[in-house]
Structures are given as C-alpha cells and as structure tokens.
Amino acid sequence: MIEFYSKARLPSRFGSFEIYVFKNDENKDHAVIVHGDVRGKSDVPVRIHSECLTGDVLGSMRCDCRDQLIESLKYIGSQPYGMLIYMRQEGRGIGLLNKIRAYNLQDQGLDTVEANLEQGLPVDERKYDYAVDVIKYFNIESIQLITNNPEKLKYLEEHGIKITKRIPIIIPPTKFDEFYLETKRERMGHLF
C-alpha cells in the first residue's frame, strides 16, 4: 500500500513534469514523474524504472539502466501525457551491497543470474505492487508499458492493469554491457 506525501513542479531537459512522492509500507520513498494530466486517461505511456545508483547516477556502463531511463523520459516528455514510476529497488531488489558483491562475482566470470544465485539471492526480487497502487491512485484506465521485461507485463496484467501496448526500449549494446544484456535476453526472457 502506498500513501501520497507531496508533489512539486519538475522542469527538466526532457519536458515539463511534476514529481510526486509516495511512501510504501516499508517506509521507502518512491518518486513518480508525471507529464501532462494522466488522471482517468487511457493508453498512458508508463515506465516502471527500478533504482540503479551505479547506472542512473554514476553512469556505469555495466548496464543500460541510465540509457533506458533517459530514453523513457524523452519519450514520455514528447507525448501529451505519461509517467515514470521510479521504484526504490536497487539491484533488481537485492540492495546496493549485494549488487556490488554481484559485480565482483561478475568480474570473476559469472553472469548476472549466476552472481545472484551464488549469493543465495533470487535472480529478481523486485515487487511491482506499489506501481499497481500508483496507477490506480491516478485512476488510469489503461497503459502503454515501456519495458523489455515480460515479468512486469505479466505482474501488472495479473493485478488488474490493462496494458494496450508494450513499447520496447532498444539501446545498442556496448562492449561493457553486451554480456549482461545477452544474459537478460537468454536467461530472463527480456524482449529486445
């Protein structure tokens, strides 16, 4: 369950947005970046983006998270309305410390899936129930989900969110993230 706390204007290089802050029952803040009026609308472009300190903030090239975030904001900002739900779920939900430990294991030759399993952690521990709550908070009729992740599609549909379209995010791989993206496609079913 989420609770709305505050909002403010957020002018950005990607357009005019408002930022909403919600807290969940784990007392984590989740940011929702909204462009235009999404209340009660259909076919709202929505990106559910999980926090990635190394990629989003530090510009790590081990993943494509920052590029996905930027491309999503550009797309949403170019539409009449849309939203990005920024979930505080670092490292596919395992937290920053375990993510850095996974990086170390990847440096030793494991892939991203094997690195989590080696630590006794799930491959992906993210939860999308708060995203469902946010979409319902805005009374959105249907969404166009900006994602490559089939698990997000499945979860949202199973929890009553009508998805009219999947919008893929195609980011050309680099020599640094090519193996990571290949693992996401082959072992996690991501749709590129």
Curated annotation (Swiss-Prot):
GO terms for biological process: riboflavin biosynthetic process. GTP binds at residues 47-51, 68, 90-92, 112, 147, 152. Binds 1 zinc ion per subunit. It catalyses: GTP + 4 H2O = 2,5-diamino-6-hydroxy-4-(5-phosphoribosylamino)-pyrimidine + formate + 2 phosphate + 3 H(+). Pathway: Cofactor biosynthesis; riboflavin biosynthesis; 5-amino-6-(D-ribitylamino)uracil from GTP: step 1/4. Zn(2+) binds at residues 52, 63, 65. One of its GO terms (cellular component) is cytosol. The keyword Glycosyltransferase does not apply. Coiled coil: none annotated. Belongs to the GTP cyclohydrolase II family. Catalyzes the conversion of GTP to 2,5-diamino-6-ribosylamino-4(3H)-pyrimidinone 5'-phosphate (DARP), formate and pyrophosphate. This is GTP cyclohydrolase-2. It comes from Picrophilus torridus (strain ATCC 700027 / DSM 9790 / JCM 10055 / NBRC 100828 / KAW 2/3). The lineage of its organism: Archaea, Methanobacteriati, Thermoplasmatota, Thermoplasmata, Thermoplasmatales. The gene is ribA.
